[in-house]
C-alpha cells in the first residue's frame, strides 16, 4: 500500500479526484491519501530544548543569557493545538504502508512543504519503519492530469536527510528559531508596557525599509528651483547638466542664450517586451490600494486555486515553463473574452524567451485551466475581489501574447548650445500596453510630439522631487530587488505585520499606504544600524538555502553559528540607540480622536478606531456627515466578518460617550 501525504484538505480532495478516491488503485498500485493541516508540530520552547542545568538560562529574557549555544539544543518538537485526532488518524492510515509519498507543496527556495511532512514522519516514528520507501511527488498544479503524471514519476529518496529539500527546510527552520535571540535582546531595551518588538530577519528589514522611507518623506522640504533651459516649437524641453539651479527666479542670468535651431542627433525605432508576470506580492500591492486587506486577497486566491481557476499561489517564479504555456494556449480566446480583451491584439501566440523558461516549478501567478463561464459566475462564487484578482492575472498572462510595445526614440540638442539635450519617446504601436491598460505599473515616459525645429531660451520653474511615500507595492518592489522572500512570503509577512487586531503589529496599512505603529516606530529607532535589520543578512540566509545541494554549497551550520557574533554586535548597537532615543516610550498613546458636531449642534469627539480597526480618512468624513458605513474585515472563530454602523451617543458602565455605534454584523462588505 502506498500512503500519500497531502498538505491540506483541499489538496487531498483534488488528489482523490485525480486518482479515483481517497483509497483505491491507480496505475496498478494501491494507495491511500491523507492530509496535513499546515504545521502539525513546532519546536518546543528554548528552555525545554536543553539539559536541566541550563533550563534557567534559556528561560530568562536577559542579556546576560545571550547568546545561546546551538549545540545545547535537542530540537524537540511539540504538537500544535487541536491536532492530536488528526495525527492519530494519519498514523493509523500510514503505519501499514510500504511506501509513503511526500506530496506536499514544492517550495524550491525554503523547502517549507517538505518540512511539514518531515515533522510528521519524525515525530510519529514512521520514518524509522524498517524497509519503508519514502518518495517525493512534485506537481506544479492540482489538475488531474498533473497529479496523475506526478504520481507515475515520483522519485524515491534513498536517504531523506541528504535530500536538498530536506536540508534546506531544516536549515531555515533552525536559523529562524535561533534568531529568536534578537527579539529577546530587543525586549531587554523595550518598556514592558509597549509589548515585545518581534525582530525576525524579514520583519526587522521591513520596519527598517519603511522607517527610512518615512523619514525621507516626512523630512523633505518642498523647494522650487529656477534654471535656464530651452523649449522647442513642439514644447519639448532641453536641459543642460552644467546649468546651475537657482533658489529664486531673479538670480537666473537672462542674457546668456538666444534662439537657435534644433539638431536631431539620432532617431531609432525601439521596442519593449511585456513586464514580468505577477507574484502574490505584486498582486497584493496593486489590489491593496482599493482597500482590500492582505488576508482577503490571500484567502480569496486560495479558494480560486483550489478550484483550478488560478495557478498555485505561493510560487517563487516570475516566468512559466513551456509546458505551462502550452497548457493555457488553447484557452486563450476564452480567457480573453471573459476579461474583455480584444482577441485580435493577441497576435504573438508563441513562447517568449523573456517569459517562458525552463527550470521553474509552479510558474508565475496566472489563470488556471478551469476557465469560468462569465464574470458574473466569478463574482457569485468569489465576490468582487475574485473578479479583480482574475482580471489582473488574466491580463498579465494575455499581455505576453501581444506584440512588443514599439516607439520612436529621438535624441536632439540645441544647435548653438549643444549641452542642452533632450530624449523623447513617441508611441507607434501599443502592443501589450493595449492589453494591460492601467495595470502597467512600470510605464515608460512617453511624449506625443517629435523634435521641433526652433528652440527658445526660457527660465524653467521646477521643484525638487519628493521622496516616495512607502506603499505595499513600493515595498514589495524593494524586497524583490534584494531577493527577500518569495512573492507569497512578502505578501503574508506584510499582512501579518499590519494586522490591526494584533496589539504587537508593527505596520499600519491604509489602502496600501504604510506607516509604523507606535511599537513599530520604537523598533525602527532601536534597531537602526543592526545586523538583523540589514537586508544583507536575509540575502545570506536565502543564498545559503539556494546553495544547498549544489557544488557551491555554503556550510549551513557555519551560517547558523555566525548568529552569536551578529547578536553581540546588535546588542551594543541597540544599547547605543536606546541611549540616544529622545522620545519617551514608557506610555502607550491613547487612540487619536476627531471632533464633530452632533445632532444637537454640540462639538464632540470620537475615537478614530473601533475594536482595533482604524478609520480611514474616507471613513471619518462619511461618519462626520452622518453616514452609515461598513468597516472591517475582523477575524472571528468562524472566519471574517464586517461591522455596519454610524456615530451616535452610547452608554458604557453608566458613562455616556459619542462614537461608532454598531448596527449589525455582516458576512461581506458587498
Each language-model region and where it sits:
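Intrinsically disordered, low-complexity regulatory segments
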Residues: 1-181, 463-466, 477
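Basic, low-complexity terminal or inter-domain segments flanking catalytic cores
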Residues: 2, 22, 123, 199, ...
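Structured, non-catalytic alpha/beta "coupling" segments that mediate domain-domain communication
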Residues: 19, 23-53, 204-247, 398-443, ...
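Phosphate-interacting basic helix/loop segments used at nucleotide- and nucleic-acid interfaces
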Residues: 73-94, 100, 207-209, 286, ...
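C-terminal or mid-to-C-terminal helical accessory/interaction module adjacent to the motor/catalytic core
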Residues: 88, 142-232, 267-271
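Metal- or metallocofactor-binding catalytic centers and their adjacent structured scaffolds
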Residues: 160, 164, 247-276
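Structured, charged N-terminal subsegments at the starts of enzyme catalytic cores
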Residues: 273, 278, 282-291, 299
Amino acid at each position: 500500500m502506498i500512503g500519500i501525504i497531502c498538505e491540506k484538505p483541499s489538496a487531498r480532495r483534488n488528489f482523490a479526484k485525480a486518482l479515483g478516491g481517497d483509497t483505491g488503485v491507480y496505475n496498478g498500485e494501491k494507495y491511500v491519501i491523507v492530509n496535513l493541516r499546515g504545521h502539525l508540530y513546532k519546536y518546543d520552547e528554548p528552555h525545554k530544548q536543553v539539559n536541566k542545568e541550563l533550563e534557567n538560562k534559556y528561560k530568562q529574557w536577559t542579556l546576560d543569557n545571550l547568546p545561546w549555544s546551538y549545540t545545547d539544543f535537542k530540537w524537540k518538537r511539540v504538537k500544535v493545538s487541536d491536532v492530536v485526532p488528526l495525527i492519530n488518524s494519519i498514523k493509523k492510515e500510514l503505519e501499514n504502508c510500504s511506501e509513503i509519498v511526500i506530496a506536499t507543496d514544492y517550495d524550491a527556495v525554503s523547502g517549507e512543504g517538505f518540512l511539514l511532512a518531515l515533522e510528521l514522519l519524525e515525530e510519529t516514528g514512521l520514518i524509522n519503519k524498517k524497509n519503508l520507501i519514502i518518495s517525493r511527488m512534485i506537481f506544479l498544479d492540482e489538475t488531474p492530469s498533473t497529479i496523475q503524471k506526478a504520481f507515475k514519476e515520483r522519485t524515491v529518496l534513498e536517504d531523506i536527510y541528504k535530500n536538498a529539500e530536506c536540508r534546506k527546510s531544516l536549515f531555515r527552520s533552525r536559523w529562524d528559531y535561533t534568531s529568536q535571540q534578537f527579539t529577546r535582546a530587543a525586549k531587554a531595551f523595550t518598556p514592558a508596557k509597549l509589548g515585545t518588538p518581534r525582530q525576525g530577519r524579514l520583519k526587522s528589514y521591513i520596519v527598517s525599509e519603511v522607517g527610512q522611507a518615512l523619514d525621507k518623506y516626512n523630512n523633505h522640504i518642498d523647494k522650487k528651483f529656477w534654471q535656464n533651459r530651452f523649449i522647442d516649437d513642439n514644447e519639448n524641453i532641453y536641459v543642460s547638466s552644467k546649468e546651475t539651479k537657482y533658489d529664486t527666479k531673479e538670480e537666473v542670468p537672462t542674457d546668456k542664450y538666444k534662439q537657435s535651431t534644433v539638431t536631431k542627433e539620432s532617431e531609432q525605432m525601439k521596442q519593449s517586451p511585456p513586464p514580468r508576470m505577477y507574484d502574490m506580492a505584486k498582486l497584493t500591492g496593486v489590489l491593496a490600494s482599493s482597500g482590500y486587506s492582505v488576508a482577503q486577497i490571500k484567502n480569496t486566491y486560495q479558494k480560486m486555486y483550489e478550484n483550478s481557476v488560478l495557478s498555485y499561489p505561493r510560487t517563487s517564479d516570475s516566468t512559466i515553463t513551456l509546458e505551462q504555456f502550452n497548457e493555457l494556449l488553447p484557452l486563450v480566446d476564452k480567457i480573453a473574452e471573459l476579461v474583455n480583451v480584444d482577441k485580435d491584439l493577441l497576435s504573438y501566440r508563441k513562447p517568449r524567451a523573456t517569459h517562458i523558461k525552463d527550470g521553474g516549478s509552479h510558474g508565475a501567478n496566472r489563470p488556471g485551466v478551469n476557465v469560468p463561464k462569465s464574470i458574473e459566475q466569478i463574482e457569485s462564487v468569489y465576490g468582487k475581489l475574485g473578479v479583480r484578482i482574475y482580471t489582473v492575472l488574466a491580463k498579465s498572462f494575455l499581455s505576453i501574447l501581444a506584440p512588443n510595445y514599439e516607439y520612436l526614440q529621438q535624441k536632439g540638442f540645441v544647435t548653438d548650445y549643444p549641452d542642452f539635450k533632450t530624449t523623447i519617446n513617441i508611441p507607434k504601436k501599443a502592443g501589450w500596453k493595449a492589453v494591460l491598460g492601467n495595470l502597467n505599473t512600470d510605464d515608460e515616459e512617453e511624449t506625443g510630439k517629435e523634435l521641433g525645429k526652433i528652440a527658445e531660451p526660457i527660465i524653467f520653474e521646477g521643484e525638487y522631487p519628493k521622496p516616495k511615500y512607502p506603499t505595499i507595492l513600493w515595498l514589495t518592489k524593494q524586497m524583490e530587488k534584494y531577493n527577500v522572500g518569495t512573492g507569497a512570503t512578502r505578501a503574508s509577512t506584510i499582512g501579518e505585520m499590519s494586522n490591526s487586531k494584533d496589539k504587537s503589529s508593527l505596520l499600519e496599512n491604509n489602502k496600501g499606504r504604510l506607516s509604523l505603529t507606535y511599537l513599530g516606530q520604537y523598533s525602527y529607532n532601536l534597531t537602526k544600524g543592526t545586523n538583523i535589520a540589514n537586508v544583507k543578512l536575509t540575502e545570506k540566509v536565502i543564498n545559503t538555502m539556494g546553495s544547498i545541494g549544489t557544488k557551491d554549497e555554503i556550510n549551513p551550520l557555519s551560517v547558523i553559528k555566525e548568529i552569536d557574533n551578529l547578536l553581540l554586535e546588535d546588542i551594543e548597537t541597540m544599547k547605543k540607540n536606546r541611549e540616544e532615543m529622545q522620545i519617551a516610550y514608557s506610555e502607550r498613546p491613547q487612540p487619536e480622536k476627531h471632533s464633530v458636531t452632533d445632532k444637537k449642534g454640540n462639538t464632540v469627539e470620537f475615537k478614530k478606531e473601533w475594536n482595533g480597526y482604524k478609520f480611514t480618512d474616507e471613513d471619518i468624513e462619511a461618519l462626520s456627515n452622518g453616514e452609515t458605513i461598513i468597516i472591517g474585515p475582523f477575524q472571528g472563530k468562524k472566519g471574517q466578518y464586517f461591522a455596519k454602523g454610524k456615530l451616535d451617543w452610547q452608554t458604557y458602565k453608566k458613562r455616556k460617550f459619542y462614537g461608532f455605534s454598531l448596527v449589525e454584523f455582516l458576512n461581506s462588505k458587498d
